[in-house]
């Protein structure tokens, strides 16, 4: 969901993981659903594994790749884009994928679609609010008004002009007033 992210912060995370030798593939599955870049990145890995198998006298195998993340992160949407058709259910809420399911992408790759994974107990209030803000946890877990206030405070802290410009708000001192102006 790179289309929803801050480019500066995203680039810092990309650098962080690339510095640790991870393969990073930022992708926008909504506005640019071209997933060829993903196959371009994983093909050398698959070839390397199968070359080792062949050198040991074994047959090459289809790569089996685990797709995991927090609920509502776009795992099933990614798989559907890679397959090129709707093969898994998707929804803009957590808990749509309920079981593990192997999806054959092509003759070289199978992906394991998984339900979202979270910590068993969310003790950190900020973590819980961040997850609720991105609809990774069910609405019933936290109060919607508390989440809205948290989101507005976060936007005012990180991007103060965005909320003012988007909703034509002049006074950003009172959160309840801002909620009223937006609503």
Which stretches of residues belong to each language-model region?
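Canonical P-loop GTPase G-domain recognition
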Residues: 5-69, 87
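Conserved active-site beta-strand-loop modules that form the wall/rim of enzyme catalytic pockets
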Residues: 29, 79, 109-112
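Glycine-rich, phosphate-binding/catalytic loops in enzymes
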Residues: 14-16, 84, 127-131
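Glycine-rich phosphate-binding P-loop
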Residues: 64-84, 114
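Short, well-ordered alpha-helical segments in soluble proteins
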Residues: 42-53, 82-86, 94, 109, ...
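Helix-rich effector regions associated with P-loop NTPase G domains
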Residues: 8, 23, 91-183
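Conserved P-loop NTPase mechanochemical-coupling segment
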Residues: 79-90, 179
